Amino acid sequence: MNSYWLNVYKPRGISSAKLVSIIKKVLGKVKIGHSGTLDVEAEGVLPLAIGEATKLVQMLIDAKKTYIFTVKFGKQTDSGDYAGKVIAITDYIPSKENAYAICSKFIGTITQIPPAFSALKVNGVRAYKLARDGKEVELKPRNITIYDLKCLNYDEQNATATYYAECSKGTYIRTLAEDLALSLQSLGFVIELRRTQVGIFKEENSIRIDSFNDITKLSLEEKNIKIEAILDDILVLDANDEQAQKIKYGQKCLFDYDKNVDFMWVRYKGVLLTIGSLNKNCFHSLRVFNLTQ
């Protein structure tokens, strides 16, 4: 077994890269990828692609994600979360009614400017490294989509509100929290952030690691999720011996299927062989997988 998914829950206080390096050390010589960095101060679902599953990571990067986050009103920090230094203060705290009502304003496609403290690169350098050095960071605005946003709880005494968000790739929750606060004529920053779902991978089914010293290769492999799991709702065709050989050698391959398909996968002897598209019965391979039964 060398190609599968692991639905790992990243705890607060450790970087995504560090978590990957720990898992890699346990599993040995194997390629590992993940679906998108979680901030050190954040926690939650971090699906890991093992072996050939890394060829499907882009699908998870593009998938919808859900978060639960808590905003502290009245202050703004340079990083957008509690780890940063306070750069602005206001006495105005939004009402409970407004904290709930503002959500509808953000649902749909909106423009967002990524935070300076982010992993995006500026002239080859990570933005957060420039920001930490006190250098000015200019990042271009981008369009993102908020599919759902709702206030789950409002704590008047502590001036906080907890929100649930379902969003597209490229969404920065710290920026969303700041924009929510600004729209409420206040300031705010994130004090808690938890990613609850990435595509098919959900928080309730994730691997909780209480102690990294207790991780074993066997304990991880027992929690494996088959590589095809994220393809379950996508068209699949079965290849015969001749078709499979042509696909493996990058040759033209025809299927008896009348419709054009932008994205699909092909199975050979019950195992994922390739992903690609179909145009006028001709299959065009995007990725070929080296898997065995």
Swiss-Prot record:
Its EC number is 5.4.99.25. InterPro entries: PsdUridine_synth_cat_dom_sf, PsdUridine_synth_N, tRNA_psdUridine_synth_TruB, TruB_C. The keyword tRNA-binding does not apply. It comes from the Bacteria. It catalyses: uridine(55) in tRNA = pseudouridine(55) in tRNA. The active site is at 39 (nucleophile). GO terms for biological process: mRNA pseudouridine synthesis; tRNA pseudouridine synthesis. One of its GO terms (molecular function) is tRNA pseudouridine(55) synthase activity. Keywords: Isomerase, tRNA processing. Gene3D superfamilies: Pseudouridine synthase. Responsible for synthesis of pseudouridine from uracil-55 in the psi GC loop of transfer RNAs. Belongs to the pseudouridine synthase TruB family. Type 1 subfamily. This is tRNA pseudouridine synthase B. It comes from Rickettsia bellii (strain RML369-C). The gene is truB.
